[in-house]
Each structure stands twice: as structure tokens, then as C-alpha cells.
């Protein structure tokens, strides 16, 4: 299963309402093209207020029909590594952190293994759940993406001090990455309907 991480920007307005409306208007076309919406995520920290991430999953290419005021800043395809093993929309309110890693392609599998070893202790210690760890869909991926759900920003801050086993694995993982960029977001909806649950 391929995940698309699409960064959209409204060039005329400072917030996300028009972006949400545009995605809402594309929801049936997205499904007709063989994709489901994993989530639409707006800024908390690190993303501009007039930008959102649209995350979909499917095996085909995807084209959106957007108004002239909205720009597709980036559209990148990623493949799951050790998570997710099943594919369903995000649904829990809270904080979703997109942590972008620059990596050497030769370290992708080891990074995935270290992450999987750390997560059980990490998740049992905090109100958090790893949504997925992805590698860019290329022969030699140089970018990985970790999406983690936290109940709130307080939990995210507390999770910086994980149990020893998780800490050790995270430190080993950190040494394998070239840099990391965390972006905190929240799950958005439109017209009172959760965009990720139109079934």
C-alpha cells in the first residue's frame, strides 16, 4: 500500500477552511481513483496556518481538482515499513506529529527495526500510538516519515523521557539519521463531518 503525503497551501487566505472545503469537494474523486483519506492535518507547530497535509492511501496515482488559489506544495509517495500493517483512516482527536528524517538508504531497515523494538515500552508508558513509519517510495529512499498520535501536547512533551529500553533504541536510531524535523498537527474536519470516515 502506498501513502501519499500532499502539502496544500491556500495563497489567498490565512487559515485552512478553503483547503478543507477543496478536499471535501474532492473526496468522491479520491475514492473513485482507488484511494482513501487517512487524514487531513492542520497546523499546531511547524506548519503554516494556511497549509494542511492531506494523507491518502491506495495503489494508484492520484489527481486533485483544486481552485487556482490553492497550490500543491509537495506530493510525495511513501511505503510503510513496520507500521501500519492494516490500513484505515485516522480517527482520534489529539496531536499528530509528522517527524521527517533524512537518512542514508542503507539504514532504512535498521531504523525500522529499532523503532519497532522501542514502541511497546513507549506506548505503554504514555497516551500515544505510532500511526506509521514510512520510507519514501524510491529505489534508494533518503527520507523517512514517522507519524505519531499523542493525546495532547502535554503527553508529547512528557514522552521526551521514555523508559530506558525505548530510550536506548531511540538513541541508536537517532545516530543513524542525518537530521529530523518534527511538525505537530491536529486532525481536521469539514461541515461537521470527519473527512476520514466517509464510507
Locations of regions flagged by a protein language model:
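Surface-exposed interaction/gating patches
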Residues: 2-13, 82-153, 192-197
